[in-house]
């Protein structure tokens, strides 16, 4: 099970827009999809995008019907504008952090599978939430961009305090070395 290293906030590469993948898939892309599956399973995730392992390609996985499904070059083509759910979300790139995010309860997505077949499928509920979250990653959008302003401010203040504590500990270690 080759696990890839996760890119975590505040790494700027999470804000980059991913490039489309061409077909037939290269061996490198096939290997990336397998590694994404392994990484997602090992990390206990329900979805992952290539950008989260430092690869800016439009490849993502989302849990659906008990398995991780690959979506290549996904595009959300329609949403249920009158059915928005505000629910908790986590992210492998924001370890241990969960916050409420508004998402459409139903989405229709056009994508390619690993064989290069173009598909159009509809998803609802939790799977729709995962698909939207991972497509956001491919578009350079992170949870912070979707959070309510007050939650975002609270998160950034907490993160700043954590960095100050870490900096202080490192400084003390350097002095005693």
Question: What residue ranges belong to the model's regions?
Answer:
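Positively charged
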Residues: 1-177
């Amino acid at each position: 099970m080759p696990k890839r290293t996760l890119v975590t906030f505040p790494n700027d590469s999470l804000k980059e827009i991913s490039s489309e993948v061409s077909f037939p898939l290269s061996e490198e892309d096939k290997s990336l999809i397998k590694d994404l599956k392994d990484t997602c399973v090992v990390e206990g995730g329900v979805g992952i995008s290539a950008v989260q392992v430092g690869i800016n390609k439009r490849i993502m996985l989302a849990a659906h019907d008990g398995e991780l499904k690959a979506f290549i070059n996904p595009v959300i083509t329609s949403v249920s504008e009158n059915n928005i759910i505000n629910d908790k979300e986590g992210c492998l790139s924001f370890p241990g952090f969960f916050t409420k995010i508004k998402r459409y309860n139903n989405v229709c997505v056009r994508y390619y599978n690993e064989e290069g077949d173009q598909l159009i499928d509809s998803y609802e509920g939790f799977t729709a939430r995962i698909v939207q979250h991972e497509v956001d990653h491919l578009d350079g959008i992170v949870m912070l961009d979707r959070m309510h302003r007050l939650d975002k401010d609270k998160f950034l203040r907490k993160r700043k305090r954590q960095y100050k504590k870490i900096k202080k500990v490192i400084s003390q270690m350097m002095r005693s070395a």
